[in-house]
Amino acid sequence: MVADAQVSESKTAVRRGRLVVLAGPSAVGKSSVVRLLRERMPELVFSVSATTRDPRPGEVDGKDYRFTSRDEFQRMIESGELLEWAEIHGGLQLSGTPAAPVRRAIEQGKPVLVEVDLAGARAVRAAMPEALLVFMAPPSWDVLVERLTGRGTESAEVVERRLATARVELEAQDEFDEVIVNEDVSRSCDELVSLLVGRPEQSESTH
């Protein structure tokens, strides 16, 4: 019994958590899916991105995003605190992923979700090749345009920039390991849960 317990403890110690990187166009519904995912998977570690944009209604600093100034963001870049970072929508804002919480959670064997843009997904893949890249796509282009313009929270210029960015992102979805078409929030959430916990390491499952 003691030997079995020691073997089990050893396996737990060496198992690394799964890192899933989620990207997709603005207004594709990522936030709604992630919100439901966090309710269904309380053990999930969700990487809180640092961003220089202003909070949207209902967003909480430190929970939804780490809202920061450009000066503070620049300091984080220079001190190597970010796993990835990028200029978003033609330089309107800066966004990045603090590295320490992600690496710590993976070493502890926890499932980790990082939500980034296309450039961020590429950067995480370069830094952590074991990451599983997941692209969330809209049912159609028309649906995406309707969702984005229906927000009513951004100027026409910002909307046009977001649409231009979305075209580039949609053209790059073949770079991702998995594609989820977000027609239904609950179903998309189920697919993410499966990707986060449904593929145990073969080396461990066969022993």
Swiss-Prot record:
Entry GO CC: cytosol
Alphabetized UniProt keyword annotations: ATP-binding, Cytoplasm, Kinase, Nucleotide-binding, Transferase
EC number annotated for this UniProt entry: 2.7.4.8
Cytoplasm listed as a keyword: yes
PROSITE patterns associated with the record: GUANYLATE_KINASE_1, GUANYLATE_KINASE_2
Sequence ranges assigned to domain Guanylate kinase-like in this UniProt record: 17-197
Chain residues that bind ATP: 24-31
Primary localisation category: cytoplasm
One Pfam family of this chain: Guanylate_kin
Subcellular location: Cytoplasm
Coiled coil: none
Reaction catalyzed: GMP + ATP = GDP + ADP
Alphabetized InterPro entries for the sequence: GK/Ca_channel_bsu, Guanylate_kin-like_dom, Guanylate_kinase, Guanylate_kinase_CS, P-loop_NTPase
Domain of life, per lineage: Bacteria
UniProt-recorded Gene Ontology molecular function terms: ATP binding; guanylate kinase activity
Keyword flag Cell membrane: no
General function of this protein: Essential for recycling GMP and indirectly, cGMP.
PANTHER family: GUANYLATE KINASE, GUANYLATE KINASE-RELATED
Family: Belongs to the guanylate kinase family.
NCBIfam families tied to this protein: guanyl_kin (TIGR03263)
HAMAP family: Guanylate_kinase
Protein known as: Guanylate kinase
